[in-house]
């Protein structure tokens, strides 16, 4: 899984093409020199002295520019193309100078995929307090020179491949240890994003409500009119169902007899004599009262 990362690290100059670790030592306040060999094809290239890289690139302390020497504080470097080696000198040693260093050749990217380097372990031991002042002075001015035999590029590449496997394991451990932190940061970012979205939504709703209130305040009369209650009487018209026309009902007929008012009665004393029958026969017969009929219909 991490093989592409290991290959990428092999392409970075100054990383992971190491020879076997060499150890040099010097007293506190003294100095020491380290002689680092290189191949013939690296004669014109720049050489450097650096701390091992923490991530990708190593932290170069001092580097040559051509054949001229270079100094950076208490550390100096000088190239000797005739001897196919360069020398690094550390002066006025302190306990903080102890540790692992690399002396390497800065190869161009297109010529080589890795820098051939030699790992050097520097140890600093305290100066003996039982020495005489003359001995202490001699210790301070003493110089320890360590020369390493040349190491071929093939050996460097093989050792670098072995070391890259260990670097790969260390990288996996670092990533695994930092994975919970990355997941926590991702969860925090998601929570912040959700919170920002909710806040923006609430502000948008408030803005819409504020716009509605401003429109009502601009038209107070219209707002008052709209707020009043209006009542109206609604009369519902009942429309008959569209059914077949009902047959007309029979007309009820009522009959009544209307008689003219009778004349008032008159009483008289009548004396019948022999001529009565004749008079009665001669007297005209009274007509019967007329009867009027009318038809009253109930609608």
From Swiss-Prot:
Primary residence: membrane
Tell me where in this chain the PTM Phosphotyrosine is found.
293
Q: Per UniProt, what is one GO molecular function of this protein?
A: phosphatidylethanolamine binding
The keyword Ribonucleoprotein is annotated on this UniProt entry: no
Membrane topology field: Single-pass type I membrane protein
Q: Which residues form a coiled coil?
A: none
State which residue ranges cross the membrane.
181-201
SMART domains, alphabetized: IG
Q: How is it modified after translation?
A: Phosphorylated on tyrosine.
Tissue specificity statement from the Swiss-Prot or TrEMBL entry: Expressed not only by natural killer (NK) cells but also by T-cell subsets, B-cells, dendritic cells, mast cells, granulocytes and monocytes.
Report the subcellular localization: Cell membrane
* Chain segments carrying region Disordered: 278-299
Listed under GO cellular component are: extracellular exosome; ficolin-1-rich granule membrane; membrane; plasma membrane; tertiary granule membrane
Provide a GO biological process annotation: regulation of innate immune response
Q: Which SUPFAM superfamilies match?
A: Immunoglobulin (SSF48726)
Q: Does the keyword field hold DNA repair?
A: no
Q: Please name the InterPro entries in this protein's record.
A: CD300_family_receptors (IPR050671), Ig-like_dom (IPR007110), Ig-like_dom_sf (IPR036179), Ig-like_fold (IPR013783), Ig_sub (IPR003599), Ig_V-set (IPR013106)
Q: Tell me the function of this protein.
A: Inhibitory receptor which may contribute to the down-regulation of cytolytic activity in natural killer (NK) cells, and to the down-regulation of mast cell degranulation. Negatively regulates the Toll-like receptor (TLR) signaling mediated by MYD88 but not TRIF through activation of PTPN6.
Oligomeric and partner information: Upon tyrosine-phosphorylation, interacts with PTN6/SHP-1 and PTPN11/SHP-2 and INPP5D.
The protein's name: CMRF35-like molecule 8
